[in-house]
Amino acid sequence: MAKIVDIKGREVLDSRGNPTVEADVLLDNGIIGSACAPSGASTGSREALELRDGDKSRYMGKGVLKAVANINGPIRDLLLGKDPVDQKALDHAMIALDATENKASLGANAILAVSLAAAKAAAQDQDLPLYAHIANLNGTPGVYSMPVPMMNIINGGEHADNNIDIQEFMIQPVGAKSFAEALRWGTEIFHHLKAVLKARGLNTAVGDEGGFAPNLASNKEALEAIAEAVANAGYTLGTDVTLALDCAASEFYKNGKYTLSEEGEYSSAEFAEYLAELTRKHPIISIEDGLDESDWDGWKVLTEKIGEKVQLVGDDLFVTNTKILKEGIDKNIANSILIKFNQIGTLTETLEAIQMAKAAGYTAIISHRSGETEDSTIADLAVGTSAGQIKTGSLCRSDRVSKYNQLLRIEEQLGSKAVYRGRAEFRG
C-alpha cells in the first residue's frame, strides 16, 4: 500500500487572471498527483466557501495564500501516512478538521485541490486511468459512457460584457454517433456562428467561457443567430442538434421580479411562462437556473409547466449539496442537478450528489466554472460516473478545449466500450 509522504500547495492563475489553488500529493513510491481548484463568477449563496486573502495590496484582494498555507500546514499534517486510495477517509478527515458547514475554516478551494490531487495519485498508483479509478470510487467499476457536450457558444450575463441577460446559450449535438463526431459538429457550428455574427456587423469577441459575446437586441435574437449557424453548417435543429439555456436567473432577480434589460419585468409565474414559450418556439430541451435560487414556489410552477418535457437544472438552486438536493427531490423541484465539485469541496461529496440525483431519476450534468485552468479532471468525472452530460464551455480557449481533448483521448482509449447515447440522455 502506497502512503502519502508530502502535500504541497501553491498559488497559480485561472483563466480570468485570478489566483487559484493548486495542490500536489506525493506518494512514497515517487508518484505525484496534481490538481487545481476552479472558481465561479455567478455563484450560489449556499456554495462552500472559496477562501480568499482579502489583502488589497495583492491581486486586488483575491490572493489565496491563506488557502495555500492551510494545505502546507494543517491539511498536510493531517494526511501524511494515509492511503491515497481511500478517498472517503481522506475527504472525511479534511471535512472534520475544517468543522464548518461550508468549509470556511480551511477553504473549499484548499480542500478540493487536495481531494482531487489525491485521487489522481491513487489512480496512478493502481496503474488506472483517472476515469476508471473514479468509477471504482463511485461503486460502478468498468461502467462508462461518453457525455453529450453542452457547448456554450453565446455568452451573456455575468460571463460577458454585453446586454444579453441569459448567461449561456448552448448547443447539444445529440444526433452524433460518437463524442468525436459531436465535437466536430459543435466546432463547425461555432465557426459558422462567427460568420453569422460578422455578417450582421456584430462583435465576435469571446466571453469567459469562449462563447461569442455580441450585443443583440434580445435573448430571442441570440437563439435565431444560433439557428442560422446550425443550418449553415448543414445540420438540422431539433434532430441533429438541440438547444439549452443557462438563465442564471438569480443575477437578474430583484425585489421579487425578473428584470430583462430589453424586455421588461416579469413575476415568477410570468417568467416561467416566458421560458415555456421559448421551448415551444425553439428546440430547447434543457434550462438551467430558470428561476432564482430562493424562488422555490416559482420553481414548482416551472417544473409543473414543462418538467415532463424539458430538463430543468438546478445549479445555484442545489449547489452540489445533497441536503438541498434531497429537499428539492422531496418537493418535486426541478429534475436535474448541475455538478460543480468546488461548490461542495470534495470528490466524495460530489459522487454522493451524483448518486442521489440518479437514484431519484434526476439527471446529473458535470460542469466547469467560468474561472478554469488546464486541469481536465471533470472530463474523467463525467466518464467515470456515466453522468451522460458535460458543460465545459465553447470551442475555443485552451482552458475549455483541454477538457474536450481529454474526452477525445478517453473515447479513443475505451474503443468499443465508449458509449455515446446522445438524445437518450435527456427528457422528453
Curated annotation (Swiss-Prot):
It catalyses: (2R)-2-phosphoglycerate = phosphoenolpyruvate + H2O. The keyword Metal-binding applies. InterPro entries: Enolase, Enolase-like_C_sf, Enolase-like_N, Enolase_C, Enolase_CS, Enolase_N. (2R)-2-phosphoglycerate binds at residues 167, 340, 369-370, 391. One of its GO terms (molecular function) is phosphopyruvate hydratase activity. Pfam families: Enolase_C (PF00113), Enolase_N (PF03952). Keywords: Cytoplasm, Glycolysis, Lyase, Magnesium, Metal-binding, Secreted. Its EC number is 4.2.1.11. Pathway: Carbohydrate degradation; glycolysis; pyruvate from D-glyceraldehyde 3-phosphate: step 4/5. Catalyzes the reversible conversion of 2-phosphoglycerate (2-PG) into phosphoenolpyruvate (PEP). It is essential for the degradation of carbohydrates via glycolysis. This is Enolase 1. It comes from Pseudomonas syringae pv. tomato (strain ATCC BAA-871 / DC3000).
